[in-house]
C-alpha cells in the first residue's frame, strides 16, 4: 500500500463532497467522539444538533477536530482530519442570516437533521429538541490517500547467475570448449 499526503486544494475538494464525519471534542483530559452530518462552505463546516453532551463540551472548549473518510478497501481509502474552532449560531436576530445560510446548505441533503431530531431518552428523561446550528472554522487540515502498490510484471529475463551445469554459462562454454555433456 502507498500512502500519499493530499494537497490543501485536494483536501478541500474532497471535503466538499463528504457529508458524514466524526467530531472529536474534549472536556478536561477526556475526549469524546460522535458522528455528525456536515456541509463544507467557504472555510467552515456547518452542522445541526440539539442540546447534548457534544454541544455542552464544545461550548466549554471550542477547539475541535472532525475526521471524515471514504473507504474502498483496506488498501484504498482517503482520510481527512480538520482542526478548527466551534462557533454556535444562536437563535437571535443578528444571527438569522448565518442560521438561514446553515439551513440552506444543510437542507440539500435528505438526512441533514438526523440524528439530532431523533427522540432521545437519557436517564429516563426525554431530551428537549431545541435546534442548534453551528459552524466549525477550519484552521488547518491534513489529508491522506492510500492506494494499492502497483504490481510489477513478472521478470522474464534470463538470470545472470549460473545455476550449475545446465545454466547459461555452461551452455555457452560447451560449444566453445568442444565438450559435450554425456
Regions found by a protein language model. Give the residues of each.
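Residue-level preference for beta-strand/loop junctions
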Residues: 17, 30-32, 60, 78, ...
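Beta-strand-connecting loop/turn residues
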Residues: 43-44, 62, 139
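Charged, gly/pro-rich active-site loop segments
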Residues: 2, 76-182
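Active-site-adjacent structural patch at catalytic or cofactor/ligand-binding sites
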Residues: 50, 60-69, 76-87
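Extreme N-terminal tail/first-helix region
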Residues: 1-17, 155, 161
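Surface-exposed connector loops and short turns at secondary-structure junctions
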Residues: 55-59
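Short beta-strand segments
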Residues: 18-50, 66-67
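Secondary-structure transition/turn motif
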Residues: 49-53, 147-149
Amino acid at each position: 500500500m502507498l500512502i500519499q499526503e493530499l494537497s490543501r486544494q485536494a483536501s478541500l475538494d474532497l471535503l466538499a463532497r463528504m457529508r458524514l464525519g466524526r467530531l472529536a471534542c474534549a472536556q478536561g483530559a477526556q475526549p469524546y467522539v460522535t458522528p455528525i452530518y456536515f456541509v463544507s462552505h467557504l472555510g467552515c463546516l456547518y452542522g445541526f444538533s440539539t442540546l447534548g453532551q457534544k454541544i455542552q463540551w464544545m461550548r466549554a472548549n471550542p477547539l475541535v477536530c472532525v475526521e471524515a473518510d471514504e473507504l474502498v478497501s483496506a488498501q484504498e481509502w482517503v482520510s481527512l482530519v480538520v482542526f478548527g474552532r466551534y462557533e454556535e449560531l444562536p437563535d437571535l436576530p443578528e444571527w438569522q442570516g448565518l442560521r438561514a445560510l446553515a439551513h440552506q446548505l444543510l437542507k440539500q441533503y435528505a438526512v441533514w437533521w438526523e440524528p439530532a431530531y431523533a427522540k432521545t431518552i437519557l436517564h429516563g428523561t426525554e431530551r428537549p429538541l431545541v435546534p442548534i446550528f453551528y459552524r466549525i472554522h477550519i484552521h488547518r487540515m491534513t489529508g491522506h490517500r492510500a492506494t494499492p502498490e502497483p504490481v510489477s510484471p513478472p521478470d522474464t529475463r534470463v538470470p545472470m547467475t549460473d545455476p550449475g551445469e545446465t545454466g547459461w554459462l555452461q551452455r555457452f562454454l560447451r560449444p566453445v570448449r568442444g565438450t559435450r555433456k554425456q
